[in-house]
């Protein structure tokens, strides 16, 4: 369902009544969750957003977003968990196991065929047709997909594990997963087996060559029934998958030696020190605590890891920053009521100077390579000039006509060549050009045509450029240049008042610079922890505007200038950023 990009219709903060209804719906849909787990999944006070979108096939989907990650989605009044939720509650749904090579096809939009299932020693989970199920990979219980069973367990066994097993709705690495923090599945060890089962499983790992051949082509049967379904890669034996199982099991022991809370505390401090050492400069101070977290700490989180303060011992960012202040690394002040800012940093503190920037993991880089979106590169914007009807006679000798687009250097060359070809350079003063009838008609005002006989070169060229119509050329990476008349509109940032005297930040003209308003809205929603909406821009045909709750000009400016590297001259409204100490 989310194998291709979707279109966001709206993104708003959830109301109290809707939050209570969602809790009730979660309790009904997933009765195995306890009251505390439901409260953890649907928090009482933390921000929770409702995103309404259209999937690429037109299905209307409602997505619930908490902490920047989609946690649930609703389709045709049915509630489904995302992989982010299943990683926290891996036993929420009956789970079926497949081989790692199959994942690529599931991400591409294929359903899971029964030949791709791995039969566990205890047998397949008992499900009925239409039941919601999770799909995991051999060696790791963390689900990588969810789907609906196409038949009951009894029918699966009766069919000899042939045919369509599950209609897949959502997977790790699809576009719904990409709308979150893009973390990788955690390593969750398989459930413990008794000695008899362990012996049986160990024996099953030693596959003979015949069985390996059957496994290599197991998905081809499914492909006959469903053209989108997977085919195992010919250059990699599936016998490697069970070997990975034992390796993952060994690696899990070292990870389990520390509690999840201790691991999150270490990650929090690592991102904190990394951000101070590499991203924050003295000129950035004072720096809003929320900006420090959203624009600096999150970007320092290693690939495959998810920074979640709520899972640390600190629980809140303010408490963590107070601890760092006690260690005299930073100084924090409340410059406006309820809003904390970092006002000073001791960059000579031993913890900062001794901090070693971690190198990116080759494994995580490989895992994320296929799913990482191409980075944004600013367009090449070139000013041009368009030949109007009144200037046609001057430019037609050089092969140009009305409506031709020229660069400034081309205009200069054409005018100089015209003057020299027609012997218009003054013999007594080479810096002057005599004006013939064509030049008079093209560049002089009516009241000047009988008084001005000569012009200096610079004045002639300046007047010529002024008489031409402005135009511009935009070239986006990998695309053909786009040429338009007029001057390119800058990205326009404004502040507006809405109901209850609330401020919102509105940004327009993103499309002219190759930016997708929906993508920008999603990024700002996570960075600012504020609701965002995308609406048609008033008075502009086929143009959209992004609206963010509160004064978010600082976050927006950082995104456009620092991350997207857009020139400041193409952005207007940056001066409206909230000043330190000023109340929102």
From Swiss-Prot:
Phosphoserine found at: 237, 254, 361
GO CC, any one term: cytoplasm
Residue ranges of domain PUA in the record: 93-173
Cellular compartments annotated: Cytoplasm
Biased amino acid composition, Polar residues: 247-257
InterPro entries: EIF2D, eIF2D_N, eIF2D_SUI1, Pre-PUA, PUA, PUA-like_sf, PUA_eIF2d-like, SUI1
Disordered, as annotated region: 223-257
Spans traversing the lipid bilayer: none
Cited CDD domains: eIF2D_C, eIF2D_N, PUA_eIF2d-like
GO molecular function, one term: RNA binding
Residues with PTM N-acetylmethionine: 1
GO biological process: formation of translation preinitiation complex
Biased composition (Basic and acidic residues): 227-238
The family this protein is said to belong to: Belongs to the eIF2D family.
Protein name, per record: Eukaryotic translation initiation factor 2D
Species: Pongo abelii (Sumatran orangutan)
């Amino acid at each position: 369902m989310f194998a291709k990009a979707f279109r966001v219709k709206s993104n708003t903060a959830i109301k109290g009544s809707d939050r209570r209804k969602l809790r009730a719906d979660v309790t009904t849909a997933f009765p195995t969750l306890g009251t505390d787990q439901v409260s953890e999944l649907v928090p009482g006070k933390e921000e929770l957003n409702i995103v309404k979108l259209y999937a690429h096939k037109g299905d209307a989907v409602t997505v619930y977003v908490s902490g920047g990650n989609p946690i649930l989605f609703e389709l045709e009044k049915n509630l489904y968990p995302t992989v982010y939720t299943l990683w926290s509650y891996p036993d929420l749904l009956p789970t079926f196991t497949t081989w790692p090579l199959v994942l690529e096809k599931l991400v591409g939009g294929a359903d899971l065929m029964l030949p791709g299932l791995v039969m566990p020693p205890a047998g397949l989970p008992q499900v009925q047709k239409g039941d919601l199920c999770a799909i995991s990979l051999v060696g790791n219980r963390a689900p990588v997909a969810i789907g609906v069973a196409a038949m009951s367990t009894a029918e699966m066994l009766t069919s000899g594990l042939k045919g369509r097993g599950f209609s897949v709705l959502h997977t790790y690495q699809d576009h719904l997963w990409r709308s979150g923090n893009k973390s990788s599945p955690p390593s969750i060890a398989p459930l413990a087996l008794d000695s008899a089962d362990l012996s049986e499983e160990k024996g099953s790992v030693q596959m003979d060559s015949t069985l390996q051949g059957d496994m290599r082509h197991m998905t081809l049967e499914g492909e006959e029934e469903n053209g989108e379904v997977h085919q195992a890669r010919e250059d990699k034996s599936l016998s490697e998958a069970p070997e990975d199982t034992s390796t993952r099991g060994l690696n899990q022991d070292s990870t389990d030696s520390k509690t999840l809370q201790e691991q999150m505390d270490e990650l929090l401090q690592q991102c904190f020190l990394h951000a101070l050492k590499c991203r924050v400069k003295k000129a950035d101070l004072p720096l809003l605590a929320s900006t420090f977290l959203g624009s600096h700490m999150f970007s320092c989180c290693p690939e495959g890891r998810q920074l979640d303060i709520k899972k640390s011992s600190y629980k809140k960012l303010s408490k963590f920053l107070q601890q760092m202040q006690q260690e005299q690394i930073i100084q924090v002040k409340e410059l406006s009521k309820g809003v904390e800012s970092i006002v000073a940093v001791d960059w000579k503190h031993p913890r900062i100077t001794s901090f070693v920037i971690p190198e990116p993991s080759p494994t995580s880089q490989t895992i994320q390579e296929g799913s990482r979106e191409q980075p944004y590169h600013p367009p090449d914007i070139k000013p041009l000039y368009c030949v109007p009807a009144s200037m046609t006679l001057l430019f037609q000798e050089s092969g140009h006509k009305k409506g031709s687009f020229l660069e400034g250097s081309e205009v200069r060359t054409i005018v100089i060549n015209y003057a020299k070809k027609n012997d218009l350079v003054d013999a007594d003063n080479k810096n002057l050009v005599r004006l013939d009838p064509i030049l008079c008609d093209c560049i002089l005002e009516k009241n000047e045509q009988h008084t001005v006989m000569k012009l200096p070169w610079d004045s002639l060229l300046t007047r010529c450029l002024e008489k031409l119509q402005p135009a511009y050329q935009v070239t986006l990476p990998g695309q053909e240049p786009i040429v338009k008349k007029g001057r390119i509109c800058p990205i326009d940032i404004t502040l507006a008042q809405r109901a209850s005297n609330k401020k919102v930040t509105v940004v327009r003209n993103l499309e002219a610079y190759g930016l997708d308003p929906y993508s920008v809205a999603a990024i700002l929603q996570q960075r600012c922890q504020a609701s965002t909406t995308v609406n048609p821009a008033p008075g502009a045909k086929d143009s959209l505007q992004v609206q963010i709750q509160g004064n978010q000009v600082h976050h927006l400016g950082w995104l456009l200038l620092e991350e997207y590297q857009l020139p400041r001259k193409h952005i207007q409204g940056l001066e409206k950023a909230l000043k330190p100490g000023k109340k929102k």
